[in-house]
Each structure stands twice: as C-alpha cells, then as structure tokens.
Amino acid sequence: MNEFEKESLDLFSYQYERNPVYRSFCDLTNVSPLDVDSIIQIPFLPVTFFKTHRVSCKKEDAFIFESSGTAGTTSKHHVASLSQYEHSFRKGFTQFYGQPENYHILALLPGYIERPNASLLYMCRDLISKAKIEFSGFYLNQFEELHKALIALEEQQKPTILIGVSFALLDFCEQHPMQLQHTIIIETGGMKGRRKELIREEFHQLLKKGFGVSNIHSEY
C-alpha cells in the first residue's frame, strides 16, 4: 500500500467517524471502515447531497463556497479551514507549474466577480496576488485589453498563464485567434447554459487551434 492509499483510507475513516451525513449514507449502503481495505471500495457521496444537506465534519464554518447554481439550486462546500484550502491549491499549483511569482496570471472569469463565494474566484485572486503584477489580473469581458496584454507578453517572451471559464475562452479565441508560445491555457469548465455543450476532446481541439498551442490544461 502506497502513501496515497494509506492517507485515503485514513481520511475515509475520519469522514465516517465525524461527518454525520456521510456516515448515514455509508450505513445505508452497508459499508463501514471495517469493510474497506482498498480505495476503490470507498463509497462516493452523490454530489446532489451538497445541494440538499450540510456536508461537514465541523459545526463551525470558516467559509462556504457555492456553485454557480445553473440548474437553479447552488451546491455548498462548507470549509472549516481556509488555510487548509489555500495550502491545497497552492501546493497543487507549485507541483505542476512552479511558483506563481514566475508567471503573469490572467483570469478570464466573466460573471465570477458577482459571485464572491466561488472557490475558483478565491483561488485565482490568491494566485494573482503572488504573480508578476504588470499584466496579471481579472479581465472579465475585456477581450481587447486581454488581447493586447497577451500580445505584449508574447513579444517579451514572458511566462504567462491564462485561466478562464470554457465559454469565455472559446469566445475570446474565436474573436482573437493567436499563436501563443509562452502561454499556458487552463480551462475551468463552465459551458452549461452559455454555449452548445461539447465533448472535452472537441472543445480542447477548438482551443488548441484558436490559441495555437499543443496542450490545454484543466482545473475543475
């Protein structure tokens, strides 16, 4: 058993013991830590529960993140420790990209500034605060300004990350097709109700063509 599997099983036991909603679900499916010796046996709580129940191990929340609620009801993620959440996404970022200080980070997130409880907005705001400051920031629907910033960064060969919701990235690269050599594109989902739904491979091909890159990264 590797370290990841051991940690996963320990977390399953912790959630079972301290999370009343999750424990009830496991009991109803006749699964307990005594029955589980592999990560593939750990029960997955249906995501709809985050719309209908308070899913948490703690009685007090440091913050509550909410989904977009495109279907009418928002899902709620009760966070007991913001520092733990920050440690998680910062470590994930540095593992794949290095330090945010090494990049210009541009965020194309129309609609998110009006949603202060969005975890994506929280993460991007934190990373942007640590990034190089000249062009880093939120561009919302400012396609012309974003286009000029990307051109300037490409001309200076500056390492850049453009992170954005799917429909906005697609709208942008259709209006401003580019050939980017120093920019990483990260899509975060978010096509529902805004444009025709595409399978991931088809969507990524459109972004690759529009931005002139060989890979598209994802963050969900």
Model regions and ranges:
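Residue(s) in the substrate-gating loop at a strand-loop-helix junction
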Residues: 120
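Beta-hairpin (beta-strand-turn-beta-strand) motif
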Residues: 68-70, 82, 108-111
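Active-site glycine/GP-rich loop and adjacent strand/helix microenvironment
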Residues: 1-14, 18-21, 98-104, 111, ...
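A glycine- and small-aliphatic-rich helix-loop capping segment at beta-alpha/alpha-beta transitions
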Residues: 123
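Phosphate/oxyanion-binding active-site loops and adjacent basic polyanion-contact surfaces
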Residues: 81-85, 116
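Poly-acidic low-complexity segments
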Residues: 32, 46, 81, 127, ...
